[in-house]
Amino acid sequence: MQQLREYKRFWFVIVLGAIALWLQFVNHQAGWAQILVTVLGVFLALLMFIDMVKTLRSGKFGVDLLAITAVIATLAVSEYWAALIVLLMLTGGDALEDFAARRANSELQELLNNSPQTAHRAVGDDIADVAINEVVVGDRLLVRPGEVMPVDGTLLTGPTTVNEASLTGEARPIDKQVGETVMSGSVNGEASIYLRADQTADNSQYQNIVRLVKQAESQPAKFVRMADRYAVPFTLLAYVIAGIAWGFSGDPVRFAEVLVVASPCPLILAAPIALISGMSRASRNGIIVKTGTTLEKLAQVKTFAFDKTGTITQGKLVVDQIVPVTAISQADLLQLAASAEQHSGHVLAQSLVAASTEKLLPAADVNETTAQGVQANIDGQTIRAGKAEFVTDKPVDKADKTAVYVSAAGIYQGYVSFSDKLRPEAKDTMADLHRLGVHNLVMISGDRQPIAKQIAAEVGIDQVHAECLPADKINVLAELPADQRPVAMVGDGINDAPSLATADVGIAMGAHGATAASESADAVVLKDDLTRVSAARDIAQWTMRIARQAVLIGIVICTVLMVIASFGVIPAIIGAVFQEVVDTVTILYALRARTDR
């Protein structure tokens, strides 16, 4: 709506300006042309004054006061064509700035689409589908294989395996036994289960994520734009020069002539054009930056926080270690495990099959026990692969990470462990961010502390926060001290959506990530390449350097013109034309932000 309003103002000025030109130079009715421009100028000045009051009430400063004064002053001394030029510049700059500040259309649509809509309520032997908001605490609910847990609850039957990636971001399967709790939004495994509803839908974990995002969106961080920081001193300088010129000359026209050349073109045009140019350059590099303000913040970020799975890592469990405890070779141990698991749909089974370099052996009499493992007959031997207690009754040295244990003919043979593979570019990305002035790199993960610390050490991250749910991630960001702000958060999943919205700058890895994360973020990396994050920081810093230089060049030129105009040698209409020259210079300089260094 804001963008539409500014475009309407711009076209309103163009249309009425064209009519005024026709009245004066074609119909030779200068009086009507002046009246039309005067009414237009007073009307828009009033609208700008209302906007300025709203801006001041929000705690921000702008350049509207100077612009309003310039319009009113030129109209008061009958320099209405100069006023029209100023109006064109102002409304055109506002429309351009709003174009640069594009926003996401549907911030939470993916979260809402994926949230459970119905539940299977069980009453005795009868199963009935009910709307999710009709579930009450204590209801007995059926959850079929592959379905999303509708509410937070306690397992009445089991065991089962659940995927909590949408909540914690971690891809590893979680085994759940009877009596354990499950969270809404987690995906059930391959066995139908019954659960008792412990919470209503509105109070369950998945809906809590939606609320967290909404809350973060409604409480944006305060931020002072570069143009606003220059606005106050520039406005005061213009009024001082204009007042002195009027005071010494006694001619109010002199006041208008100074303010016309002081119209804040560099602040209104140069910065937005530099930002649009920087956004265009970012887009060419596979990074969608949604607003110009995002680039300003990104250039100032002191802390980068990263989710682990899917961001620093690839989000896929791969075979990490093969540890035999008998004379069996590593290749044979992996072959046995993969052969036994080859018909299973379990995520670890798929990883085993993908990792095996040997031909898979035929498996007969395959029997899979949910959340425990697989038993099969291979080459006349009973092979078991799965949890340690499933494959052997004897105590074994367990891996400190996700693992599949293997036994043959009742003899424990060893285990195959898994890890989430690091992105090959992760370490270089962290080094680049350090080089670009980011001294605090943080990892916030839902994974266990030892694994999170190991990953952080390998890539060069400074702080680690592990075993975090979405609300915990928000708390970590909120508790960062002032000297480590602004903060940028980088993530890829639905579970990252609240923290992306909470951070000063949210960056979503959108190549394979959830739409909810992308829409809650301020910037989206379209390519599956973490180095784009450091590239975004580099582009933001370069863009703001060019924007700052363009603004300062414009201010210096305007100041020189104000001093000259104070002696009465620049008529208002000529001053307005000079302003367009200043516009051209600052715009051409600002466009440098489109190019690489």
Where are these regions (language model features)?
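P-type ATPase nucleotide-binding
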Residues: 25, 144, 319, 323-440, ...
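Conserved ATP-binding TGD loop and adjacent catalytic N/P-domain core of P-type ATPases
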Residues: 380, 408-549, 587
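Conserved catalytic phosphorylation-site environment of P-type ATPases
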Residues: 68, 167, 267-340, 480, ...
